[in-house]
From Swiss-Prot:
UniProt similarity note: Belongs to the bacterial ribosomal protein bL35 family.
Matches recorded under PANTHER family: 54S RIBOSOMAL PROTEIN BL35M, LARGE RIBOSOMAL SUBUNIT PROTEIN BL35M
Any GO BP: translation
Pfam families: Ribosomal_L35p
Signal peptide span: none
A GO CC term assigned to this protein in UniProt: cytosolic large ribosomal subunit
Gene3D superfamilies for the chain: 4.10.410.60
Keywords: Ribonucleoprotein, Ribosomal protein
SUPFAM superfamilies per record: L35p-like
GO molecular function, one term: structural constituent of ribosome
Official protein name in the record: Large ribosomal subunit protein bL35
Entry superkingdom: Bacteria
UniProt-listed HAMAP family: Ribosomal_bL35 (MF_00514)
Gene coding for it: rpmI
Length: 66
């Protein structure tokens, strides 16, 4: 009987897969000390980021049932 693969919970909270198999994540630097950051910078930080293809392979090992 084969063992089940475990999902890394920290990765599950940080990353999500799109329908096409790309990986989305929330950008950093938008929690505190926001007064010195420009409106344009904060607006761009609200957008989700996409990982590059070689990082996607690593995330898929952390999230086997992703």
């Amino acid at each position: 009987m084969a063992n089940k693969m475990k999902t890394r919970k920290s990765a599950k909270k940080r990353y999500s897969f799109t329908v096409n198999g790309k990986v989305k994540y929330k950008k950093q630097n938008l929690r505190h000390i926001l007064t010195k950051k420009s409106s344009k910078r904060k607006r761009n930080l609200r957008k989700s980021g996409n990982l590059s293809c070689f990082e996607v392979k690593r995330i898929k090992t952390l999230l086997p049932y992703g």
